[in-house]
């Protein structure tokens, strides 16, 4: 499993990456999560403009065998949904790059830094 060092992680297996402006971030599911879910066939997300609290559900990922909720890693506003998700298998193929789910304006960049780093996430997953 791939666990990039430059991301932060949640216990719910989402990742977040602050962009260069320091207040906008990309969010997706981890390689571990996509592997556990299996073949992803559909992703449903709340619309851009939705304001989320930390841990609030912002969508679902539907795989062949199950449906999993997606939880906001931090509070903020959804700015953009990944247009490539029309082909949901992109999440399986490239969860950390082309398979990102949403771009969000984070309410507190400090909250991102408080999430799990790569080493802590490795320990959580046993990888």
Swiss-Prot record:
Domain Lipoyl-binding, first and last residues per copy: 24-105
The keyword Chaperone belongs to this UniProt entry's keyword annotation: no
Textual note on the cofactor: Binds 1 lipoyl cofactor covalently.
A GO cellular component annotation in the UniProt record: cytoplasm
Names of required cofactors: (R)-lipoate
GO terms for biological process, alphabetical: glycine decarboxylation via glycine cleavage system
Source organism, top-level taxon: Bacteria
Residue(s) carrying N6-lipoyllysine: 65
Keyword vocabulary terms for this entry: Lipoyl
InterPro entries in the record: 2-oxoA_DH_lipoyl-BS, Biotin_lipoyl, GCV_H, GCV_H/Fam206, GCV_H_sub, Single_hybrid_motif
UniProt-listed SUPFAM superfamilies: Single hybrid motif
Pfam family, one: GCV_H
HAMAP family: GcvH
Quaternary structure (record): The glycine cleavage system is composed of four proteins: P, T, L and H.
Database matches in PANTHER family: GLYCINE CLEAVAGE SYSTEM H PROTEIN, GLYCINE CLEAVAGE SYSTEM H PROTEIN-RELATED
Similarity annotation: Belongs to the GcvH family.
Function: The glycine cleavage system catalyzes the degradation of glycine. The H protein shuttles the methylamine group of glycine from the P protein to the T protein.
Protein name (database record): Glycine cleavage system H protein
Taxonomic lineage from the root: Bacteria, Pseudomonadati, Chlorobiota, Chlorobiia, Chlorobiales
């Amino acid at each position: 499993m791939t666990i990039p060092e430059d991301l932060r992680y949640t216990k719910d297996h989402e990742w977040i990456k602050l962009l260069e402006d320091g207040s906008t971030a990309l969010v997706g599911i981890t390689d571990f999560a996509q592997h556990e879910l299996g073949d992803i066939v559909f992703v449903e997300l709340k619309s851009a403009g939705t304001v989320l609290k930390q841990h609030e559900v912002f969508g679902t990922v539907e795989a062949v065998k199950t449906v999993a909720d997606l939880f906001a890693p931090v509070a903020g506003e959804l700015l953009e949904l990944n247009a490539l998700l029309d082909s949901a298998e992109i999440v399986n193929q490239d969860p950390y790059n082309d398979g990102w789910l949403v771009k969000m304006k984070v309410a507190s960049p400090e909250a991102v830094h408080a999430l799990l780093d790569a080493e802590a996430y490795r320990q959580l997953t046993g990888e």
